[in-house]
Swiss-Prot record:
Name of the molecule in the record: Chromosomal replication initiator protein DnaA
Gene Ontology CC terms, in alphabetical order: cytoplasm; plasma membrane
Lineage of source species: Bacteria, Pseudomonadati, Pseudomonadota, Gammaproteobacteria, Pseudomonadales
Organism of provenance: Pseudomonas aeruginosa (strain ATCC 15692 / DSM 22644 / CIP 104116 / JCM 14847 / LMG 12228 / 1C / PRS 101 / PAO1)
PROSITE patterns registered for this protein in UniProt: DNAA
Region (Domain III, AAA+ region): 178-394
Record keywords, A-Z: ATP-binding, Cytoplasm, DNA replication, DNA-binding, Lipid-binding, Nucleotide-binding
Record field: transmembrane: none
Main location: cytoplasm
Function: Plays an essential role in the initiation and regulation of chromosomal replication. ATP-DnaA binds to the origin of replication (oriC) to initiate formation of the DNA replication initiation complex once per cell cycle. Binds the DnaA box (a 9 base pair repeat at the origin) and separates the double-stranded (ds)DNA. Forms a right-handed helical filament on oriC DNA; dsDNA binds to the exterior of the filament while single-stranded (ss)DNA is stabiized in the filament's interior. Non-cooperatively binds DnaA boxes in the plasmid RK2 replication origin (oriV). In vitro in the presence of plasmid RK2-derived TrfA and E.coli protein HU, forms an open complex at oriV. This complex was not however competent for formation of a pre-priming complex with E.coli DnaB and DnaC. Broad host range plasmid RK2 requires not only DnaA for replication but also TrfA and host factors.
Subcellular location, record wording: Cytoplasm
Positions of ATP binding: 222, 224-226
GO biological process, one term: regulation of DNA replication
InterPro entries: AAA+_ATPase, Chromosome_initiator_DnaA, Chromosome_initiator_DnaA-like, Chromosome_initiator_DnaA_CS, DnaA_C, DnaA_dom, DnaA_N_dom, DnaA_N_sf
Length: 514
């Protein structure tokens, strides 16, 4: 049984599941083959149990179909390909968690756990076993201080928000904890695009030390990741005003570390960051290629999880896709729960506008909100910016908000939107280029001569328009947004490995943008 066959089945499952479900439960799985056995590694017990209960049956069906009826012995384990215990003995007809061998007590985040056997309901399914796995990367609490960096690392400014509370530590190092009081769960507008992320954040905020740890939120700019992070912090302080909750941008962590090295106060730096109750770090991708910062954060992360302290991280991309980030950090980020925050769909955009207008005590007609939401699709930040312009124009002109006033106040923005490439134009151009009919792109045909141009057209639509994935899917014959996401990723891979696809995409891009 080859890993390639497993990947084929995962790709098929990607098309069947909503992107949030796939990215949360299936994407973190790692796999390797040894003889006739296929080993699948989950990052933690929670993911393993969920996959076992919800997706194992379908995965085995796909393996059987693709493997021409020959099913492998499948083992589900906790850990990763680089960090695992020897495989458990295979037990017929049921999954079984083998008791761990006697070992020295490991750090809490990677402590072996056991569970009651889970019976596979179908007699014809192959034996499946689960076993815990122990990390081989122990926390090193007494990491020696090193000399200051030869070359100074860039240090970004902290978020421009009102300081809520100061936290001081013994010694020279002092730090301010930033939380924006206006970012709460109560004023966060929930929709299909952020439903799972909001639920996970609330679980952490309301059940500290019993929620997901770490919680990793990822997605494009202006989609609400930072809002949710602040909402967690504000809720924790509401429940316990004495809690040490620290929010900061990743570059602030770098700046504090450099300053501590310069002041010969690295021990105070460590003591401060490792004594918080909850550490909230925004834009973790800025740690990329900062080796010393990654080293220090690695030990800080381990210390916090060992002490049962909460860590919440955000990034603009899936952790495995952050280039220049050490694999050991990527692996640890998967210990808890990783959730995508998608661009808001039309209904959510309208709800956001109505909520913002209510907060500003402005009367916004529903048709006016709908008009703005239809034309501003990229992210919440741009949506709010457009609404502020409309409100200001209404105030200065002394006129109520109408569609006519919106056209006046946003005329430059709307003119820019009108110049954007349309999906119809992309479909027409791609069909002409590949000498097929537009109706073929919208059809259910799956032959390569049609499927590949369709994927190219979807990828171009994602790159050149502001339409959301669901909207692009509807434009291509009512397809699901997960199909669009799969097409975009597939074309991105082929542009790296296939010269013909790379040239086709380049030519089409030039045609559509000139």
């Amino acid at each position: 049984m080859s890993v390639e066959l497993w990947q084929q089945c995962v790709d098929l499952l990607r098309d069947e599941l909503p992107s949030q479900q796939f990215n949360t439960w299936i994407r973190p799985l790692q796999v390797e083959a040894e003889g006739d056995e296929l080993r699948v590694y989950a990052p933690n017990r929670f993911v393993l149990d969920w996959v076992n209960e919800k997706y194992l049956g379908r995965l085995l069906e796909l393996l059987g179909e693709r493997g021409e009826g020959q099913l492998p012995a499948l083992s589900l384990l906790i850990g990763s390909k680089r960090s695992r215990t020897p495989r458990a003995a295979i037990v017929p007809s049921q999954t079984h968690v083998a008791p761990p061998p006697p070992v020295a007590p490991p750090p809490a985040p990677v402590q072996p756990v056991s569970a009651a056997p889970v019976v596979v309901p179908r007699e014809e399914l192959p034996p499946v076993t689960t076993a815990p796995s122990v990390s081989s990367d122990p926390y090193e609490p007494e990491e020696p201080s090193i000399d200051p960096l030869a070359a100074a690392m860039p240090a970004g400014a902290a978020p421009a928000v009102r300081t809520e509370r100061n936290v001081q530590v013994e010694g020279a190092l002092k730090h301010t904890s930033y939380l924006n009081r206006t970012f709460t769960f109560e004023n966060f507008v929930e929709g299909k695009s952020n439903q799972l992320a909001r639920a996970a954040a609330w679980q952490v905020a309301d059940n500290l030390k019993h929620g997901y740890n770490p919680l990793f939120l990822y997605g494009g700019v202006g989609l609400g990741k930072t809002h949710l992070m602040h909402a967690v912090g504000n809720h924790l302080l509401k429940k316990n005003p004495n809690a040490k909750v620290v929010y900061l941008h990743s570059e602030r962590f770098v700046a504090d570390m450099v300053k501590a090295l310069q002041l010969n106060a690295i021990n105070e730096f460590k003591r401060f960051y490792r004594s918080v109750d909850a550490l909230l770090i925004d834009d973790i991708q800025f740690f990329a290629r900062k080796e010393r910062s990654q080293e220090e954060f690695f030990h800080t992360f381990n210390a916090l999880l060992e002490g049962g302290q909460q860590v919440i991280l955000t990034s603009d991309r899936y952790p495995k896709e952050i280039e220049g980030l050490e694999e050991r950090l990527k692996s640890r980020f998967g210990w808890g729960l990783t959730v995508a925050v998608e661009p808001p769909e039309l209904e959510t955009r309208v709800a956001i506008l109505m909520k913002k207008a209510e907060q500003a005590k402005i009367e916004l007609p529903h048709d006016a909100a709908f008009f703005i939401a239809q034309r501003i699709r990229s992210n919440v930040r741009e949506l709010e910016g457009a609404l502020k312009r409309v409100i200001a124009h209404s105030h200065f002109m002394g006129r109520p908000i109408t569609i006519e006033l919106i056209r006046e106040s946003l005329k430059d923005l709307l003119a820019l939107q009108d110049k954007l490439v349309s999906i119809d134009n992309i479909q027409r151009t791609v069909a002409e280029y590949y000498k097929i009919k537009i109706s073929d792109l919208l059809s259910k045909r799956r032959s390569r001569s049609v499927a590949r141009p369709r994927q190219v057209a979807m990828a171009l639509s994602k790159e050149l328009t502001n339409h959301s994935l669901p909207e692009i899917g509807v434009a291509f014959g009512g397809r699901d947004h997960t199909t669009v996401l799969h097409a975009c990723r597939k074309i991105a891979q082929l542009r790296e490995s296939d010269a013909d696809i790379r040239e086709d995409y380049k030519n089409l891009l030039r045609t559509l943008t000139t």
